[in-house]
Each structure stands twice: as C-alpha cells, then as structure tokens.
Amino acid sequence: MSYPHSGCSYTYSPVDFCDAAHRAQIDEAIRTQVPNFKTHYILAQLEERKEYFQRSIVLIDSRDGTVYPLPIDAFSGPLVGKDGAREYGKVETSLQADTFCVSSALLVYRAFEEGRFCFGFDGVRFTGHATQYMQ
C-alpha cells in the first residue's frame, strides 16, 4: 500500500485486506478472472457488507499476484434516503483502458460521496479522483 496504512488496512479504515474472508475472495479472483484493466490487471470487486450492497475494489497484477486495494472502505449504488443503497454500484473498465470509473456512493473514512469517480493506476499508486485515504 502506497498510502498511510497499518499493515493490510488504510489508516482508520475498518477493512483488513489480509483477513481470511478477503484473502479467499482475492484467491478466487486470481483463479477465475482474467485481466480486465490496463492489459495485465484484474480489477476485482470484493464483498464487504451485502446487506448494504457494499463492495471494495482491488487491482491484482496477473503477472505476480500483487494486490493493490483502492483507497476506499466500500462502494455501493446510489443512497436512497435513510434506507441507504438498494443496489450495487457500477464499475466501468476495459482491458486496454488507462482509467476505470465507479458510479456509486463511495464510503471513505465514515463519509459518503456520491457520483462518478475515475481512477488510474501508475503501477504503484492510484491516480485520478483523490480519496481521504490518499492524503
């Protein structure tokens, strides 16, 4: 992780990308998915809190298995009043693309931000939309 972190979590984030549940989902993505971003990365969505339609995103380098978590806690579909999201957020990517976009409500450091957010990846760090964890 190229941003402030404590092992496998961004500082102040409740998401531990090294716990058994996340490792199992990452291992499954490596086994079953093909690169879908920037020629050799697998952009994988990991389940976080299904009851709130929340997922996280990781990039996995298909050449060596290195995992790069997007610096968010989770993303979901649009928030609908007090009930929250009623669907999953949408991710746009392609094998040759230099950016991917997330149309959603991003949850970062206990705050939501809604819209369409685009990110790039330079091989070490995410670029484009800046989240609180990237500060």
What residue ranges belong to the model's regions?
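Acidic, small-residue rich beta-repeat scaffolds with periodic aromatic anchors
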Residues: 1-8, 13, 88-135
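Terminal domain-start segments
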Residues: 1-33
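Structural signature of eukaryotic scaffold interfaces centered on beta-propeller domains
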Residues: 27-36, 84-97
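Mid-length scaffold segments of soluble, non-membrane domains
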Residues: 33-69
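A short acidic, glycine/proline-enriched capping/turn motif at secondary-structure boundaries
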Residues: 49-50, 75-76, 106-108
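Short, surface-exposed coil-to-beta transition loops
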Residues: 52-57, 84-87, 112-114
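Glycine-rich loops and low-complexity Gly/Arg-rich segments
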Residues: 67-70, 84, 126
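Surface-exposed loop and turn segments in beta-propeller and other repeat-based domains
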Residues: 72-83
